[in-house]
Amino acid sequence: MKVGIVSWGAYIPKYRIRTEEVARIWGDDPLRIVDVYLVDEKSVEGIDEDAVTIAVEAARRAIRRAGIDPKKIGAVYAGTESKPYAVKPISSILVDALGLSNNVFAVDMEFACKAGSEGLVAAIGLVKAGQVEYGMTVGTDTSQGEPGEHLEYSASSGGVALIVGRDGVAAELEAVYSYVSDTPDFWRREGSPYPMHGEGFTGEPAYFRHIIGAAKGLMEKYGYKPSDFAYVVFHQPNGRFPVRAASMLNIPMEKIKPGIVVTHIGNTYNASALMGFAKVLDVAKPGDKILLVPFGSGAGSNAFVFTVTDVVQERQKTGVPTVEDMLRDKIYVDYAQYLKMRKMIKLFD
């Protein structure tokens, strides 16, 4: 039974702050910072935006692109690290905001930056089992970085929604694989406004071990070679990590470059790999194979292989904004505006 991505929708807030502007405030060398992280600028949510509004907009675009009745969506999953409420699901808000049926499975997923991709696994399972006609997952974040700390140069905002189904599949799922371990690379305790990270744990023991473990494990299990893929998309905490991961897997740069978005919008956390995936789907051709490998701290990676079908051409002509459209549509803000828009200026009586 053919199961896969029926539609996709993305949303990137139009506001941007340049890396050099953040570096100016903290006295860092902007050229060195850009060279280290390969992030020129990052997206910033508007004063009236949060992870929920971003998720709603991305999901509306996915539904519009699919051209389906939203009431046919029988499951909705939301993955985020930046919930507006400590106790109140985003998924239930999506049900009413999108006009879904009340007879729907709705869950907020938890696994750092790969919670949205865990929703994809769950949606695929329900559709494949015949329990729902369509399932949706949304990866959305307004990610946090402590002022003056290096995460501030990349932590950004954005969202991606994927609709899974059996009919009208634009990218058919061929294989999925997972690699997980208890690795304390990144965390945020209850009540803490900003996350902490384990410095040396974030690279080799966390990102590379799990990205490579998932991608290599999938290829070995199912017999894929790097040459089989037209596009490869990894989680993008910065501009260097995905390029290095590709090199470690002998994947040429031309296969990974089309899905790189971090240079222009920073690390959108749960939307990071999914944003690159959406960007690739915007231009992919029938027959193309796509390797998608999200990563979540704590730590784990899922690896997916999709084959693009003829339906993708119809989906690409719906007039829904592409990721490239949103990368070009931007308004720059200074650091003071950035603090205001991110509600980081606290007033006390």
UniProtKB/Swiss-Prot annotation:
GO molecular function: acetyl-CoA C-acetyltransferase activity; hydroxymethylglutaryl-CoA synthase activity
SUPFAM superfamilies: Thiolase-like
Top-level taxon: Archaea
The EC number(s) this enzyme carries: 2.3.3.10
GO BP term, pick one: farnesyl diphosphate biosynthetic process, mevalonate pathway
Pathway: Metabolic intermediate biosynthesis; (R)-mevalonate biosynthesis; (R)-mevalonate from acetyl-CoA: step 2/3
UniProt-annotated binding residues for CoA: 240
Enzyme class: transferase
Keyword Iron carried by entry: no
Annotated residues for binding of (3S)-3-hydroxy-3-methylglutaryl-CoA: 29, 113, 154, 202, 235, 244, 267, 297
Catalysis performed (reactions): acetoacetyl-CoA + acetyl-CoA + H2O = (3S)-3-hydroxy-3-methylglutaryl-CoA + CoA + H(+)
Keywords: Acyltransferase, Isoprene biosynthesis, Transferase
Residue positions of the active site: 81 (proton donor/acceptor), 113 (acyl-thioester intermediate), 235 (proton donor/acceptor)
Subunit structure comment from the entry: Interacts with acetoacetyl-CoA thiolase that catalyzes the precedent step in the pathway and with a DUF35 protein. The acetoacetyl-CoA thiolase/HMG-CoA synthase complex channels the intermediate via a fused CoA-binding site, which allows for efficient coupling of the endergonic thiolase reaction with the exergonic HMGCS reaction.
Family: Belongs to the thiolase-like superfamily. Archaeal HMG-CoA synthase family.
Role, per record: Catalyzes the condensation of acetyl-CoA with acetoacetyl-CoA to form 3-hydroxy-3-methylglutaryl-CoA (HMG-CoA). Functions in the mevalonate (MVA) pathway leading to isopentenyl diphosphate (IPP), a key precursor for the biosynthesis of isoprenoid compounds that are building blocks of archaeal membrane lipids.
Entry protein name: Hydroxymethylglutaryl-CoA synthase
